[in-house]
Amino acid sequence: MATFAKPENALKRAEELITVGQKQEALQALHDLITSRRYRAWQKTLERIMFKYVELCVDMRRGRFAKDGLIQYRIVCQQVNINSLEEVIKHFMHLATERAELARNQAQALEEALDVEDLEADKRPEDLMLSYVSGEKGKDRSDRELVTPWFKFLWETYRTVLEILRNNSRLEALYAMTAHRAFQFCKQYKRTTEFRRLCEIIRNHLANLNKYRDQRDRPDLSAPESLQLYLDTRFEQLKVATELGLWQEAFRSIEDIYGLMCMVKKTPKASLMVVYYGKLTEIFWMSSNHLYHAYAWLKLFSLQKSFNKNLSQKDLQLIASSVVLAALSVPPYDQSYGASHLELENEKERSLRVANLIGFEVEPKAENRVALSRSSLLSELVSKGVMSCVTQEVKDLYHLLENEFLPLDLALKVQPVLSKISKLGGKLSSVSSVPEVQLSQYVPALEKLATLRLLQQVSQVYQTIQIDNISKMIPFFDFTVIEKISVDAVRRNFLAIKVDHMKGLSSLVNRVLRRKDSGIICLFLAESLSKARTMIYPPAKKAAKLGEALSNLAEIVEKEHKRLLARKSIIEKRKEEQERLLLEMERVEETKRRDVQKMTEEAEQKRIAAEYEQRRNQRILKEIEDRELEEAQALLHEAEKRSKRKKKPVLEGEKMTKKVIMELALNEQLRERQEMEKKLLKFAKSMDHLERAKREEAAPLIESAFKQRLAEEAALHEREQQQEIELSRQRHAGDLEEKRRLARMLENKRILQEKVVSSREAEFTRMKRERQERISQIIQSRKQEREARRKMIFFLRSEEERQKRLQEEEEARKREEAERRKKEEAERQAKLDEIAEKQRRRMLELEEKEKREREEILRKSTAVLPKPAEPPTLGRPAELGGAAPIPAAAATAPTPGPGKYVPKHLRTKMDGAGQAPPPETDKWGGGSKPDDRPSWRDERKPPSFGSGSRTSWPASRR
């Protein structure tokens, strides 16, 4: 490490090293001087040294050296002359930018220069080999070799300057200027990665500034000038992010602006808020978040209408139309339908966060938060009078989509309105943040909304509809796109649609009818099913309560016993579970106690280690202070030894602090410097008198020597002039002799020249004639090729048209055949339906007739005999038509009692007594034939269960 008595010596030494080409040694010498503790008092020489230092750092691309030097120089200049640091930093950035631009221009010039030896060759062999080996083009190689290192150094320069100026309240303007230049660098050269890092760096600087706001020399954000600088930086960051297409970084910049305003509790000016909401509209549109996009447009409209006095009526109409179209572009269903609870919570938090950004409340209150929705947005548009400012086309579109009920021709009426709206828009003359408004960007979203509205209205009118009819009613999209839109709407619970591609039908469900009338329909269905069950299974008569209780007593006792056993087992299981839980709780408590004990021991060990580390740090700091004090005292003693004064300052031992000793040493150095300047001034004065005396004595001697020198030089000039004239005469005579000698060959030279010229003219004429013949041949051949190609193209087009015509004829024939088959199938199905309907009516008539006959028979039988208590038990022979065996005791029974079985022979006796015997009924309730033997046809006939049953009979049975 070189030691210099004065800073000027170091600068002089560095210049000498630069002259001989040793720039590294010169940089190291200046670096040692700047980082030395001997030169901590600012002086003008240090500024010149820093200028030279940064020039060397830029020339050699030593960013680390530059950062160390600027940090040390900041320490020197912070309290004395901060403007010097500003000048050095500006010079540093200017040099880095200039060298980067120079390298870029050199790369472009190298790429555009014509540096080839053979103009007919495309590339040199070595260029081809290099391109095949490296795999990159010439411009890529030149950029990598020339431009990229300087761009890296320029980026490192910006980072270094921002790091140095981040906590300096006196250089806030320079910090903002550096940030703006870094943004422009990223924008000019499309450096997206560096832009993200730069935004993160600035964001961290603001966080640290807010965290350590009580430190000295920190910027005060409550000051209007500081706040304006920081806001301008954030808005420039927002603009560059949108121009680079970094929408996520642009949204983070919006959050940075909002966080900065919440930090200082102050709302920015209206001009800045216009830029804020203008960029918000772009961000939300690129993220396909139409709801927030519409709210941002509404805020922008309110600001422009309130604060922009130069806003023309046309511009206001365009902005209002954009607000209404953005609101209509919002999907009419809930996007979060069907999401999980965690997703709903996250969406709620995100919506509240975005609502704060759009509302821009620097002190948001929880009770004032309102969730954003499409319905509230549309009502707000009407209440704020936005609809009165829009164009007539937008009003018509709003009326069609929100108020009209046109289930068949809604899309057809919307289409011409959208075509007119797509042509509206243009540049705005008085809105700087939104220079241009194009309403055509909302047309796709509005077409989707018109499709949803049409499907919603059609579902309220029709249950099924043909897919072809839907495609005709919606001219915007193909049916595949319509199907995707419908699937999304069904998933969001907006529509209920089923599509059958085999039948070409679409089933629609009216969600309003299903919600309101579903309970009534279910009630009617339940009553009908209950009646049908009662007719099929009629309820039996209830027995006595005591008999029922006695008959079910054993079952009840068994059930009660099982229930008690189950309850006992449940109680036992609960006891075991309780014991297990108690054991588990004891084990958990023991584990917790051990963990707490372990944490206590670890905390004690950490406390002991921290105390030991603190004592060690204090000891190291004390040793450092003692060493610095000793160095200061040694410096003071050395200064006293150099001093010639007899009276020396008395050291007070431990009472003398380092600051006092440094002040004494600096005062001593200042006194020595002043004495040295006085001595130099006295010596210069004496040297001035001596020099003047010497010049007065030497003046006459110099004059006489000058006159003598003039005479000598005049004689010498005359002599040299005569010699030159003689030499010129000799050269002229020799030239004349040479001319006479060469004049004899002049005729031969002329003959040779004519011969060469004639031969070359003949050769040129021959080559010109051959070239004309070759060109005519080429023209003829190309003409023939074009003719052949034209004929081939005509033939191919004719063939394609013929094939296409044949294909269309074949498709038409197939289509006619399909329509004919469909028509025949429909006619055949109609005939079959008619035949089935006639059969059903005939069966209903037969069943109704049988029912009437059966009721008539039952009515007659109940009028003659009382109904038996128990149904008769019929054996297998009776079921097959044979007579049951008659017991002997029954023959002598005079009159059957009520509830007894009456055989056939007794019924004849009763008939003789004057009573009409009732017809015998089987277990199905049907009457038998006179001979009590049902035929084979009656045995095969299934029973009828009343009018509600429907029986299908074969055609042969009917």
Curated annotation (Swiss-Prot):
Residues 316-513 form the PCI domain. It comes from the Eukaryota. It holds the Pfam family eIF3a_PCI_TPR-like. Keywords: Coiled coil, Cytoplasm, Initiation factor, Protein biosynthesis, RNA-binding. This is Eukaryotic translation initiation factor 3 subunit A. Belongs to the eIF-3 subunit A family. GO terms for biological process: formation of cytoplasmic translation initiation complex; translation reinitiation. PANTHER family: EUKARYOTIC TRANSLATION INITIATION FACTOR 3 SUBUNIT A, EUKARYOTIC TRANSLATION INITIATION FACTOR 3, THETA SUBUNIT. Component of the eukaryotic translation initiation factor 3 (eIF-3) complex. The keyword Cytoplasm applies. It is found in: Cytoplasm. Residues 93-123, 548-696, 796-861 form a coiled coil. Residues 804-958 are annotated as: Disordered. The keyword Transmembrane helix does not apply. Residues 877-894 have a biased composition (Low complexity). The gene is TIF3A1. Residues 946-958 have a biased composition (Polar residues). SMART domains: PINT (SM00088). It comes from Nicotiana tabacum. Residues 804-859, 929-942 have a biased composition (Basic and acidic residues).
